[in-house]
């Protein structure tokens, strides 16, 4: 079941909406979803529904609420892509991390929650997934094709919970020197895993993307499920 109209208060009093999906059987672990640059759009709704079908609750906060609340853009529309890039360029990453922390806190204390919370982020959200993991806010974090990870490597020692990252070998946002830095940097912390999908570029896991690579997406999603599975455990 998907629910809208949820309001969450952040660290500074700012409030934002969220899309929430609750599973048939509760309590369950909750996955907070950090959006791409296109807002809480059709792919985010698809991701919430998919996680619910796998037995998770899901919360997808509107991270653009500070700029343009309710943004839900179509990546296939050139004008909307331009709008997304402008929103991304103006996005406050520190505030985004704070808003995700508020969403995680909200998720952890809902009646449908078993108290365990993971995070899955894409693109912008993939970068936020790493920053949230470095803060220790979630039990497990997964990031897809996060942009700018090579600029955050000083935070690698701060990651205290398992985190998994899926990166496209052909991602134009991650040139070869950045790839090397990420691989070596993440290798310094055994809690961090990074998989490179050589045939894939950016947004390879978004089903509506012209860059969608079914084989890479299927493998990444399978690894994601295996990685998140411990959250289903009844053990503390």
Curated annotation (Swiss-Prot):
One of its GO terms (molecular function) is carboxymethylenebutenolidase activity. Its EC number is 3.1.1.45. Pfam families: DLH (PF01738). One of its GO terms (biological process) is catabolic process. It is an enzyme of class 3 (hydrolase). The keyword Hydrolase applies. The active site is at 123, 171, 202. PANTHER family: ALPHA_BETA-HYDROLASES SUPERFAMILY PROTEIN, CARBOXYMETHYLENEBUTENOLIDASE-RELATED. Ring cleavage of cyclic ester dienelactone to produce maleylacetate. Carboxymethylenebutenolidase is specific for dienelactone and has no activity toward enol-lactones. This is Carboxymethylenebutenolidase. It comes from Pseudomonas putida (Arthrobacter siderocapsulatus). The lineage of its organism: Bacteria, Pseudomonadati, Pseudomonadota, Gammaproteobacteria, Pseudomonadales.
